Amino acid sequence: MIDTLCRLLDAGVTQFHVVKKCEDILLDHDYRKLDIGERWELMAGGRYYVKPYPSMLVAFAIGEVPEYGRLNIGLAHTDFPMLKIKTQPDMNRCGYQTLNVEPYGGLIKETWFDRPLGIAGKVVVQTEDSFRPRTYLYDSERAMCIVPSLAPHLRKETTGDKMNVQKELIPVYGLNGQNVKEKDILQYVAEDLGLLKDDILDYDLYLYNMDHMEIVGAEKDMIASPRLDNITSVSALVDTMCKTEKGNCINVISLFDNEEIGSRSKQGADSVMLSGIVDRIMSGLERSEERRVG
């Protein structure tokens, strides 16, 4: 279990990366990917997963003699508090190139100061077919920004909820040198991906803490890491699905997005997606049984 957790904590820098890493782990344990838009024919003893959206995943393992309607379901969320990069984010402030950001989820704001921050998320790019844009998973894999703090004798006593993110939590990504003057942050992202900036149609990008997971304590019995909420739960569920034994149940996990902002999205826990997938699991088993008997 600890191995799965370590891999997810370091690789899961956004909800999209969490789902991609979970997908890789499940594929390594004989899970088969299903297409949400195709008909499913499922087999007793089979292992399957479906990814309705890039930040949501549902996996299920069917028992050898599954009892109709008997399911064990575990839930977790793939997102966590971050700083989200706004549209048209570049700002020049007092000779520094900065980004306009907004809080995503319940940030502990003080913890974002004076840390190396990477940029990650997804980038949507135009292709020759206007109706089929391509989505890239992006991770700068290097510290692109920092939110500097003031010395105690220079700052006001504003902490926690009183802190204004737009005024006091401003990420700096460059000095006002010639190179930075000629580029904005999307130019750097495009170069990392080997693309032209003008080909970028849209993006969903975040700043993330680049600190790595560490085992701490005299007995090495504690973990210090960013993103423990909620990757710990995601890791436990994925690890359980990898080790699940074949019985007479259908074991299901659903990893939702947007819990940090209320879950009321198409990929959130307040959607009808999971109930629809459970219905399709039952229907897929019925079709397989009819074909076997017939």
Q: Whereabouts are the PLM-identified features?
A:
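N-terminal hydrophobic/helix-forming segments and targeting peptides
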Residues: 1-292
